[in-house]
A protein has these predicted regions:
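Class I (Rossmann-like) S-adenosyl-L-methionine-dependent methyltransferase catalytic domain
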Residues: 1-43, 50-101, 121-125, 139-207
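ABC ATPase nucleotide-binding domain "signature" loop
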Residues: 117
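A conserved beta-strand element that flanks and buttresses the S-adenosyl-L-methionine
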Residues: 110
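Short catalytic micro-motifs in class I SAM-dependent methyltransferases
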Residues: 113-114
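A short glycine-rich, Lys/Arg-flanked "PGG" loop and its adjoining helix->strand segment in the class I
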Residues: 124-136
Length: 207
């Protein structure tokens, strides 16, 4: 996989700026309502933290957060909000999903429109790390891209049929699985979107 020059702007700045005032996603909001405020370990991971909206929302809800993104601009934005939350812990990592050795245990793993950007050659290992990090009773919340998405021809990204996407959650409790297919805007202009919005829980009795 070709690596980007870390000193060259990524082109994501306009996207981050556009989303600066956006509230947390409805999907993450729905997931947070399902987690007890008295959860014994309020550790969350934000995979592909981007503009930082969901990281901020998690901090506001009292979660300790590990925010991960390959883009330096994203991590700089997230680091800038740290001072506003002295009572919780925020850790940031500038890192590609493909290079993750492991993930720490977490009660909530959020991956907002980010997991499909893992290279297919590394996806199986990465997904195993995500599942292994999820504590019993913990929630995964995020999106996968479907195989009818306009970007599905990009060999550097990972796409799934609905059956394949559902199969990734075998052994987990699927709380919500919604398929969305529509034409709409993207960072590169209008495109056909095909995605799956997922909330899944690791069973509390899972070893």
């Amino acid at each position: 996989m070709q690596r980007r020059d870390p000193d060259r702007p990524s082109g994501w700045e306009a996207y981050y700026a556009h989303h600066t005032e956006r509230p947390i996603s409805l999907l993450l909001g729905a997931a947070l309502k399902r987690l007890s405020p008295q959860a014994s370990r309020r550790q969350a991971i934000d995979l592909g933290c981007g503009s930082g909206n969901e990281t901020r929302g998690l901090l506001e809800a009292g979660w300790d957060v590990i925010a991960i993104d390959q883009e330096r601009e994203a991590i700089e934005r997230v680091n800038a909000i740290r001072a506003g939350f002295p009572g919780v812990c925020l850790e940031t990592r500038t890192q590609q999903f493909e290079s993750l050795a492991t993930l720490p245990a977490a009660s909530l793993i959020h991956a907002g429109m980010s997991i499909p950007f893992c290279h297919p050659r590394h996806f199986e290992k990465f997904w195993a790390q995500v599942r292994a990090a999820l504590l019993p009773g913990g929630l995964f919340v995020g999106q996968l891209f479907g195989n009818r998405d306009d970007w599905a021809g990009d060999p550097s990204r990972t796409f799934h049929s609905e059956a394949q996407a559902r199969g990734l959650f075998q052994g987990l409790d699927l709380i919500s699985f919604e398929a969305h297919e529509y034409d709409g805007p993207s960072l590169r202009g209008s495109k056909h979107w095909h995605r799956f919005d997922v909330i899944a829980r690791r069973p509390a009795s899972h070893a």
